[in-house]
């Protein structure tokens, strides 16, 4: 097996892990949506979203990760959370 094939297998495993985590995150977002509905709260919470963005940008600094890519990914996650809520 070539080095490229080994790396591709590793990437595939990581991608599968990410999908499992995305499903877990989506399930939790649905639960949050149900609770918000029962409490008469609006779905979107700008304060919480800003708090999460700030925490994730700090995490990017700590691990040396591209903030632009992280912000795009986080925006995707937040948009999907709002959709399922």
Positions of PLM-derived features:
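Domain-level signature for soluble enzymes in the chorismate/prephenate branch of the shikimate pathway
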Residues: 1-85
